[in-house]
């Protein structure tokens, strides 16, 4: 019976990526990949990548030349917002996007071709990939070798291995064999349907000079394009070779069940003017769907030397294209565990198992909070623009940068990061509740769709401060400042719009007094929230003015809420008749109106 260091179940991108990462890290490893299909021809969902997965493919898997020659570069994420009747032409829909290719690359992947090519590239570096090899049994032995039984060409074969890694997707071969718990996620009740089509002209075929020049003729076609609606979104993702992926993801709690046949799917897509016009002349290739998207397992990596990657472990939602990032993270953690074990570092392995499981679960929980309860706000440009500012900043700061700095397998960094996991989740919950409340407030006022026509926001401008920072050196002080800035400016941006106090989110002395902990503390926004914010800012204002005029007899500066100007100032301790009062008041107003580095003030 042949023995391998690692056997990987499945040769989709999760399995192909993991085997390639292991082999490139340790060329002497013996690796077997077992794939049940005899041909890789299926057009799989999960075509769109973002910065973490792209960095992984380029830096860890050495696929840069291949990706640029055989797949499509991605022009970031792009979002369009319709009116209530869903009849705006594409050129009139409000848009969040970019006017140039992003600083950090990402790609649109034609999965069937990629997986076929990866199999051949992996074989070329010494990985044993067997197609038509259906796994029929597993014997997990935490003390000795595992045994994997598979059938191929009518013959039964057994192999032994030290590690077995499940990349079998929703079949979850290891989890089901061991009887481990798989939990259907109830906090996010979404489903999806999608198809692939030929002859879809794409967004760049729209002939409107003003609309094209607004983005400096950068290719909208190459973006992952989201058509945003109350409770659902429609995607248009280009693939190499004139193929377009078109799909819809919807919140069943918000809008119930949607059509699940190919004909009903197309009827639904075409009930939206912009999507209907994009689909004119499209030629059908295939259709698939999932009745429920989100689930997770209780353990991702085991001391019995097995691990899960990709959809074998968990899945959430395709919004923001996180699937390949989850694969990247799982593979990075699994590779570290396998190499630590093979190096004989038993104590370190036990610590890594605990930390890696906790970190991967944190990734699941923090990503969940990007969507849970928030599908009802997706259709409002006004709300979503601020949510995107926060989410995009958090992605670059908390997700992309640590990966690019190789911190995901740094034990010391993981320990410190996990200490704050509960607080990070509470902060996300606080903002999600606030966005949801704002959405309900706008609906009651009849203003949910008020800004959905004719608006343009350049999303990349909100993260320009990170572009050149992201890399191998993690600047923790900079990360903390940017985290506080993101939460304080977006929080006050929502508050000023909900409570009618303009200008709060751009004031330096408001932002400097609202760190992330204060945002969590003030999460239950009501009429008194502005007073609390102004009280904190007035303390700072008083301190600054006293420092400039220590002999003036100033007792304090007060800020009182004003619907017209946000707040009005009063000087306490210096009589209005005193000659210095007017000068102090003028200076206090100057200090109060001094702009801060607010995300909401960025010209998007």
Q: Model segments located where?
A:
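Glycine-rich FAD pyrophosphate-binding loop
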Residues: 23-45
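N-terminal FAD cofactor-binding segment of flavoenzymes
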Residues: 41-87
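FAD/FMN-dependent oxidoreductases across multiple families
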Residues: 230-232, 253-372
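Predominantly flavin-linked oxidoreductase catalytic cores and closely associated redox partners
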Residues: 121-274, 331
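N-terminal targeting leaders
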Residues: 519-604
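C-terminal helical "tail/cap" subdomain of flavin- and related membrane-associated enzymes
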Residues: 338-518
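Beta1/beta-strand and adjacent pyrophosphate-binding region of the FAD-binding site
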Residues: 1-14, 32
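Short beta-strand to alpha-helix junction loop
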Residues: 99-120, 255-260
């Amino acid at each position: 019976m042949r023995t391998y260091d690692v056997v990987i179940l499945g040769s989709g991108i999760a399995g192909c990526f993991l085997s390639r990462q292991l082999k490139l890290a340790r060329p002497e490893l013996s690796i077997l990949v077992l794939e049940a299909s005899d041909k890789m021809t299926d057009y799989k969902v999960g075509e769109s990548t973002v910065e973490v997965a792209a960095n992984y493919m380029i830096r860890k898997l050495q696929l840069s030349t291949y990706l640029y020659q055989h797949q499509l570069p991605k022009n970031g994420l792009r979002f369009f917002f319709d009116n209530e009747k869903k009849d705006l032409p594409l050129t009139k829909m409000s848009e969040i996007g970019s006017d140039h290719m992003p600083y950090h690359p990402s790609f649109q992947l034609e999965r069937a071709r990629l997986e076929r090519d990866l199999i051949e590239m992996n074989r070329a570096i010494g990985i044993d990939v067997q197609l038509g090899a259906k796994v029929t049994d597993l014997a997990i032995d935490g003390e000795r070798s595992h045994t994997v039984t598979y059938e191929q060409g009518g013959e039964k074969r057994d192999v032994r291995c030290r590690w077995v890694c499940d990349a079998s997707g929703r079949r979850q071969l290891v989890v089901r064999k061991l009887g481990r718990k798989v939990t259907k996620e109830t906090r996010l009740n979404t489903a999806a349907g999608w198809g692939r089509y030929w002859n879809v002209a794409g967004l760049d075929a729209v002939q409107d000079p003003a609309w094209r020049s607004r983005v400096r003729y950068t290719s909208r076609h190459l973006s992952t394009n989201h058509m945003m609606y109350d409770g659902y979104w429609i995607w248009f993702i280009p693939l190499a070779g004139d193929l377009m992926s078109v799909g819809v993801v919807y919140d069943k709690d918000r809008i119930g069940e949607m059509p699940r046949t190919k004909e009903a799917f197309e009827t639904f897509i075409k009930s939206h003017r912009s999507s209907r016009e994009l689909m004119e002349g499209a030629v059908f290739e295939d259709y698939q769907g999932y009745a429920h998207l989100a689930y997770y397992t209780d353990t991702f990596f085991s001391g019995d030397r097995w691990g899960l990657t990709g959809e074998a472990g968990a899945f959430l939602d395709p919004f923001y294209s996180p699937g390949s990032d989850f694969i990247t993270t799982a593979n990075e953690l699994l590779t570290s565990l396998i190499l630590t074990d093979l190096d004989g570092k038993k104590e370190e392995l036990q610590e890594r198992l605990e930390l890696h499981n906790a970190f991967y679960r944190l990734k699941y929980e923090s990503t969940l909070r990007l969507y849970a309860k928030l599908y009802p706000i997706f259709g409002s440009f006004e709300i979503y623009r601020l949510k995107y500012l926060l989410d995009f900043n958090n992605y670059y700061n908390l997700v992309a940068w640590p990966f690019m700095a190789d911190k995901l397998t740094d034990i010391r960094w993981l320990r410190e990061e996990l200490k704050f996991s509960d607080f990070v989740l509470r902060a996300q919950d606080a903002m999600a509740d606030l966005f949801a409340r704002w959405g309900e407030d706008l609906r009651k006022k009849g203003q949910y769709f008020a800004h959905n026509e004719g608006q343009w926001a350049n999303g990349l401008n909100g993260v320009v401060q990170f572009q050149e920072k992201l890399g191998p050196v993690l600047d923790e002080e900079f990360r903390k400042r940017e985290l506080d800035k993101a939460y304080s400016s977006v929080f006050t941006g929502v508050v000023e719009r909900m409570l009618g106090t303009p200008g709060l989110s751009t004031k330096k002395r408001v932002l400097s007094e609202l760190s992330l902990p204060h945002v969590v503390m003030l999460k239950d926004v009501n009429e008194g929230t502005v007073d609390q914010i102004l009280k904190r800012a007035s303390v700072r204002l008083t301190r600054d003015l006293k420092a400039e005029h220590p002999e003036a007899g100033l007792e304090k500066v007060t800020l009182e809420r004003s619907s017209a100007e946000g707040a009005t100032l009063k000087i306490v301790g210096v009589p209005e008749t005193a000659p210095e009062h007017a000068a102090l008041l003028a200076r206090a107003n100057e200090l109060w109106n001094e702009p801060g580095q607010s995300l909401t003030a960025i010209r998007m």
